[in-house]
């Protein structure tokens, strides 16, 4: 049976502000990218989400971002190398402490939003994130955009890399994500997202936003927890994969 990792960005509520339906999503995914307090989340949400993931045997990842909670980490920031190294270490350390207190372990790091997109093309910021990860624990893997430059950069630095695709995002003809600033960039229809996820999982091409067939090789598929349709998308993806004998399972 074919297997694929299904991950979601979770733990992004803070204070009295609630985002997503994390507990229900955790019942369906195999990996949880948990916000570490910089782009979203707070200490209580972080700890509760780690415990909930661990209770469900869901793999735990540090979802690190720019220090930009007002912009939800989706604004590009020109962060100095040493600062970005330190911020990477700080965020991983926060979730590692929550994991230790829960009897769990952090297995990977997945950057968020603008940081994720920047390090896919910017070798300097990518180097800072890689350095921060290695200083904390070189056994942590990096989850990154499939086919992006950081994949080889991180591998050359000795990190294991998990290449990721997105069930709920549209792609360009060259296999890149369509900018969120453009219409149609985010997929809200469960059928469309499930069809795209099945293609990723079985090594088949997807259809780019401009109609071309695009083949994207990856071993993990993401559904954004802040998508209003997140739970419906994940439910449809899981049932569609199962119907085609694809099992949702950890990437490692």
Swiss-Prot record:
It catalyses: 5-oxo-L-proline + ATP + 2 H2O = L-glutamate + ADP + phosphate + H(+). Gene3D superfamilies: Glycoside hydrolase/deacetylase. GO terms for biological process: carbohydrate metabolic process. Catalyzes the cleavage of 5-oxoproline to form L-glutamate coupled to the hydrolysis of ATP to ADP and inorganic phosphate. Belongs to the LamB/PxpA family. This is 5-oxoprolinase subunit A. The keyword NAD does not apply. HAMAP family: PxpA. The gene is pxpA. Forms a complex composed of PxpA, PxpB and PxpC. It comes from Corynebacterium glutamicum (strain R). SUPFAM superfamilies: Glycoside hydrolase/deacetylase (SSF88713).
């Amino acid at each position: 049976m074919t297997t694929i990792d299904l991950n979601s960005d979770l733990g992004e509520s803070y204070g009295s502000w609630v985002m997503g339906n994390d507990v229900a999503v955790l019942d369906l995914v195999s990996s949880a990218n948990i916000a570490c307090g910089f782009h979203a989340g707070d200490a209580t949400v972080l700890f509760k989400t780690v415990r909930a993931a661990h209770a469900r045997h869901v793999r735990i990842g540090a979802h690190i971002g720019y220090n930009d909670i007002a912009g939800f980490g989706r604004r590009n920031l020109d962060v100095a190398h040493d600062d970005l190294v330190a911020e990477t270490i700080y965020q991983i350390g926060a979730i590692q402490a929550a994991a230790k207190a829960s009897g769990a372990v952090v297995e990977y790091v997945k950057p968020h939003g603008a940081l994720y997109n920047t390090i896919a093309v910017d070798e300097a910021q990518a180097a800072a994130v890689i350095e921060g990860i290695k200083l904390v624990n070189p056994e942590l893997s990096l989850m990154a955009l499939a086919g992006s430059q950081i994949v080889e950069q991180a591998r050359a630095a000795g990190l294991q890399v998990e290449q990721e695709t997105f069930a709920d995002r549209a792609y360009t003809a060259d296999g890149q994500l369509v900018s969120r600033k453009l219409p149609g960039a985010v997929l809200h229809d469960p059928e469309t997202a499930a069809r795209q996820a099945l293609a990723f999982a079985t090594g088949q091409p997807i259809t780019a936003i401009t109609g071309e067939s695009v083949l994207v090789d990856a071993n993990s598929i993401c559904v954004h927890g802040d998508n209003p349709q997140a739970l419906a998308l994940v439910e449809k993806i899981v049932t569609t994969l199962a119907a085609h004998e694809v099992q949702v399972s950890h990437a490692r």
